[in-house]
Amino acid sequence: MSDTLQKLPLFPLNLVLLPYEHLPLHIFEPRYKLMTKNAIEHNKPFGIILSEGKGVFSKGVKVCVEEVFKKYSNGEYDILVKGEEIFKVKGTEMDGDTVVGDVEFLPTQTGMEGPQFQKFQESYLKILLKFGVDRDLELHMKKKISFEFLQGLQLPLILKKEIININD
């Protein structure tokens, strides 16, 4: 883990996003419209973090806006974000109406290799074929990081919370 804390605007939602995962969002609240505008205009990331009751989960994922589907005249946005890095929140402060976290980024996974990975990859491809996924197999063959294998799966919130905590 890095000892350097970075400031990151936080967007609490009732979900856990994982690295490499895409999420379409409709941004309509004034404080998040401003945060989104800044992210788009200055190519700046923000963090998506699970909102739990009156608080927030201590971990989240840094996201970048990959695509702006629509910008409305009232400042609302339809966007697509992609999860990048897991972070741990060490503290928060308010910047106007936006919650800004002092975050520590956790180590990024590197690609898997070796005989054990080859066995895993073969099993993964067999499962895909068993369920009739026979398109884009080459794309599936290129996956090397565990989060890439989770793309497209509808996992329960509780399981995603466990997955994001594995780094600890």
Predicted segments with their positions:
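N-terminal low-complexity, acidic/polar interaction/targeting segments
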Residues: 1-168
